[in-house]
Amino acid sequence: MRSLAIFALLAASLAAEDPNTIKVERVSSNHRFLDGVAWSHDGFLLFSDVPNNRIYKMGSKGMDVFREKSGGASGNAFDDKGRLVTCESANRRVTRTNAKGEVEVLADKFEGKRLNAPNDIAIRKDGHIYFTDPAFGQAADQKDLPFYGVFHITPKGELSVVSRLEKRPNGITLSPNGKLLYVTGADERVVRVYDLDRQGNASPDRVLITGITGVPGGIRTDDKGNLYVACESIAIYSPDGRPLRNISLPEPATNLAFGDGDLQTLYITTRTTLLRVRLDAKGGVQEQ
């Protein structure tokens, strides 16, 4: 009964936010394919334009190019020390950049073979890193590994595989308490979930959500554990996978991140445009 009451409370909270009154604001447009939106505790936003090989930065002074020749940067995330961790899809590696701009390669090979094309990334508060390794577009012709992967990098830098998949994974995120790992399936249009232990090890996956409209890309959680999936719209689900509502968009979403000082602005990337929406909900702490 208590769990039903909690679900009803969460659903009522989201329902109170009338979708017809939500304002979707266009922030930046005329890009080629945006992805990898990430908010920094230092008060700025990063996002990738993958085919244009750039990472953009938006802060209090406006927008500028943060990095040229980004290696086909796709997913971005900041660790607890403020360092930027990036999935470089064209370079087929995961890197970490410190405040001085020094770049360190965290992963580029598994079992002696190059990664496919790292795509999206999530970082737990204790330093455990998780990323997806599909092979979209031209990367499919360069695929060396005999599977599509979900990978884990420990704080000591050790790389292991979480899941060997036949279909391509896409977005990835953590629950607010860091005990659950969520992965979207681009081909199957599902969300998988893995239990994580204190050492960062994952259980076998189970399918939590099916029948997503459009190709599911990035995924995030709010501080109540609700799931926000970038797809044809922004599809919002309860922690147990029940659909709550959708935020309609001018074009399909590729990724998303909670940002601003109160973590109540949802920044959304589509192929060509960066959007933002103010919400009553607040982003989950593991997204930072």
Where are these regions (language model features)?
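Blade/loop signatures of beta-propeller domains
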Residues: 14-23, 42, 52, 144, ...
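A short loop-to-beta-strand structural motif that recurs across blades of beta-propeller domains
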Residues: 54-56, 93-95, 148-151, 190-192, ...
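Beta-rich, blade/repeat-based domains predominating
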Residues: 23, 28-45, 69-88, 93, ...
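Sec-dependent N-terminal signal peptides
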Residues: 3-12
